[in-house]
Amino acid sequence: MAIPSFSMCHKPELLKEGKSEGQEEEGLSYEFQEMLDSLPKERGRRNRYLYLFQGFRCQAKEIQAITSFQKHFQSLPDDVVLATIPKSGTTWLKALTFTILTRHRFDPVSSSSSDHPLLTSNPHDLVPFFEYKLYANGNVPDLSGLASPRTFATHVPFGALKDSVENPSVKVVYLCRNPFDTFISMWHYINNITSESVSAVLLDEAFDLYCRGLLIGFGPFWEHMLGYWRESLKRPEKVLFLKYEDLKEDIETNLKKLASFLGLPFTEEEEQKGVVKAIADLCSFENLKKLEVNKSSKLIQNYENRFLFRKGEVSDLVNYLSPSQVERLSALVDDKLAGSGLTFRLS
């Protein structure tokens, strides 16, 4: 089956009435709400709370899903987990990884036919999120129907993931993007998915929240990046750390690196046949953006697939940020990443 098949087998009793002061989402269990009320919290965009959970900030519904995931997920030796912070190339990484892992079933060289799943399914359907799909709303999915190697995705920091992927054979691939372009992409995305009845988030407001680690969950972004970066240095056979800008500059070299890390290196025959280039072309931003499934379908609610594809460029910051904003974020990044060895190119 092209699209992963799973079923939901349990959902806890929900709290429908009499919400406490801190509850902003419906559908939270009594037990979970009690835990949530004990967490430190700060107001982020549109006055929505971000709760401090296991050392990072997250919205209530995300914490509910992460809690279910941590309690119930059982890894298998050949599992692959793709990790990103939001708006840093997640859709692209899913497409690339799925195509590499399934290339012997679905030939990317002959992908002009309608047989390849990427032509009819969004990458997020092919590689499901732990927190937004599988364990959303406290669900406990039956994953027995997933083909091997099972491939999942997450935005959670490594500290919240590590116990669930401690099996030495489980592979983790992390993709990050320079913080400037990540912010611009996130700002556009937030406004795209916001109801038309609600005013847009102004850039200056969003930028201030971003620099304070309050624009999106799973951060602050620098701690998210550093968690995976340090683990990749400590255990390079376990965690592969990739940069969006490097993939844009030399996709074929990075595809080979990714395939080798996953234990499925390209053969000389495949390279001569043009398999590497075919995967790069099939999964390119331009190709994915023009597919009907990515223009007209929806993930959930207001999350239309087309909002996942804006520009896919490097250094878009020059079109939006003032010199003082660039200076502020540059100083923040330099300070937070100092001594780590992690650096970014802006072009």
UniProtKB/Swiss-Prot annotation:
Q: Which InterPro entries match?
A: P-loop_NTPase (IPR027417), Sulfotransferase_dom (IPR000863)
What is the predominant subcellular site recorded for this chain? cytoplasm
The listed locations are: Cytoplasm
Record-linked SUPFAM superfamilies: P-loop containing nucleoside triphosphate hydrolases
- Write out the residues that bind 3'-phosphoadenylyl sulfate: 87-92, 177, 185, 244, 310-312
In terms of superkingdom, the source organism counts as: Eukaryota
Give this protein's Gene Ontology molecular function annotations. Answer: sulfotransferase activity
Offer a single GO CC term for the protein. cytoplasm
User: For this protein, what is the EC number?
Assistant: 2.8.2.-
Q: Which UniProt keywords apply?
A: Cytoplasm, Transferase
UniProt-listed Pfam families: Sulfotransfer_1 (PF00685)
Q: Which residues form the active site?
A: 155 (proton acceptor)
Per its database record, what is this protein's job? Sulfotransferase that utilizes 3'-phospho-5'-adenylyl sulfate (PAPS) as sulfonate donor. Not active with 11-hydroxyjasmonate or 12-hydroxyjasmonate.
Family statement drawn from the similarity comment of this UniProt entry:
Belongs to the sulfotransferase 1 family.
UniProt xrefs under PANTHER family = SULFOTRANSFERASE SULT
Q: What is this protein called?
A: Cytosolic sulfotransferase 14
Recorded name of the encoding gene = SOT14
